[in-house]
């Protein structure tokens, strides 16, 4: 078995995990720990980068020790060390990156630089049921909403994306509009319980093609956000928060499910994988399961514990790289707030990508 100590500090979650992979390709998470900053950032209505970086510095060493202790392991017994290096908040990324590279140098262990989105894509491999390649991934999080085809050889092709707000970002902004607090995903889900999701008619944003018509797989949530603002402003008397939250949640779910299933069927893909923080949404999981069964598309969803940012998914991504032949990145590798997923292989070239 191969083991990796994985570190994640790309935004507001400090995380460490010890992940193993056996000869049959099965993953085992022997320990995974997260120190969340949600309550602290909630006071500001969103993530404050400087605060996030400071809290990562304070939390990460203790998380690493806790993970090793719970796994009854030591750094000397770990085969490699991995850390998220892109994309994310640059200052926050530096904490895991510098820590990981320092431990790699001190213990003479390979360092594996991981793209945060590659981590989300790998999270589904931590489920009991492993998806069968090729498949379509719906990556839906606070910063990204994309449809990605994954081939049998691991090659990836983006087939759809959001042209403005990501779905998770829209949840945060609408939650703020409704006075529900941060983070928006869980807040709207809770508020929508018992609400009428069909009471308010809201737009399903589409992207026009230059030659006419609409792109069948792309997303746009900015118009929906504006429509919610106008709907709220048009209300008189007490705000029907439950119905507003349910109507917003329902239209986002409908758009994500409809376009994902259409993309899968149009490309002859029999399995749809859903990952990312928004994949934790209960209505989305239930609706996708129901509608996929109706059209004969299998669905795999990342385990609930590994939908939001965590280090176990970073470890899984690193181990997939390891089994594909990667044996480490340059210790001169830095961090980047943005880096295309399509160029992730450049992290493993002799010359650091950044």
From Swiss-Prot:
GO terms for molecular function: iron ion binding; N(6)-L-threonylcarbamoyladenine synthase activity. Its EC number is 2.3.1.234. One of its GO terms (cellular component) is cytoplasm. Its cofactor is Fe(2+). Required for the formation of a threonylcarbamoyl group on adenosine at position 37 (t(6)A37) in tRNAs that read codons beginning with adenine. Is involved in the transfer of the threonylcarbamoyl moiety of threonylcarbamoyl-AMP (TC-AMP) to the N6 group of A37, together with TsaE and TsaB. TsaD likely plays a direct catalytic role in this reaction. The keyword Iron applies. Substrate binds at residues 139-143, 172, 185, 281. CDD domains: ASKHA_NBD_TsaD_bac. HAMAP family: TsaD (MF_01445). Binds 1 Fe(2+) ion per subunit. This is tRNA N6-adenosine threonylcarbamoyltransferase. Fe cation binds at residues 116, 120, 309.
């Amino acid at each position: 078995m191969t083991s990796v100590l994985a570190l994640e500090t790309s935004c507001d979650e400090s995380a460490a995990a010890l992940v193993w992979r056996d000869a049959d390709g099965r993953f085992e998470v022997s320990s995974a720990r997260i120190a969340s900053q949600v309550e602290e950032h909630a006071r500001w209505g969103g993530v404050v980068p400087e605060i996030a970086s400071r809290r990562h510095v304070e939390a990460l060493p203790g998380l690493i020790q806790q993970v090793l202790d719970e796994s009854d392991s030591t750094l000397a017994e770990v085969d490699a060390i991995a850390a998220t290096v892109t994309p994310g908040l640059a200052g926050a990324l530096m904490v895991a990156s510098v820590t990981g590279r320092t431990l790699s140098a001190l213990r003479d262990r390979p360092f594996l630089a991981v793209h945060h989105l590659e981590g989300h894509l790998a999270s589904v491999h931590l489920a009991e049921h492993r998806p069968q390649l090729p498949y379509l991934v719906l990556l839906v999080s606070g910063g990204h909403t994309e449809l990605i085809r994954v081939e049998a050889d691991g090659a990836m092709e983006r087939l759809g994306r959001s042209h403005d707000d990501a779905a998770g970002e829209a949840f945060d902004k609408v939650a703020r509009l409704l006075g529900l607090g941060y983070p928006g995903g869980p807040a709207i889900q809770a508020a929508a319980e018992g609400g009428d999701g069909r009471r308010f008619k809201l737009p399903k944003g589409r992207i026009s093609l230059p030659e006419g018509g609409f792109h069948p797989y792309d997303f746009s949530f900015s118009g929906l956000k504006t429509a919610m603002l106008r709907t709220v402003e048009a209300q008189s008397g007490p705000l029907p928060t439950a119905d507003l939250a349910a109507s917003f949640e329902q239209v986002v779910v409908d758009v994500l499910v409809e376009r994902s299933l259409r993309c899968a069927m149009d490309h002859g893909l029999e399995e749809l994988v859903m990952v990312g923080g928004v994949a934790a949404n209960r209505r989305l999981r239930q609706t996708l399961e129901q509608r996929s069964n109706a059209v004969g598309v299998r669905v795999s969803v990342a385990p609930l514990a590994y939908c939001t940012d965590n280090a176990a998914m970073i470890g899984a991504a690193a181990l997939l790289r390891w089994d594909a032949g990667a044996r480490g990145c340059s210790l001169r590798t830095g961090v980047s707030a943005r880096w295309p997923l399509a160029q992730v292989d450049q992290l493993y070239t002799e010359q650091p990508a950044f």
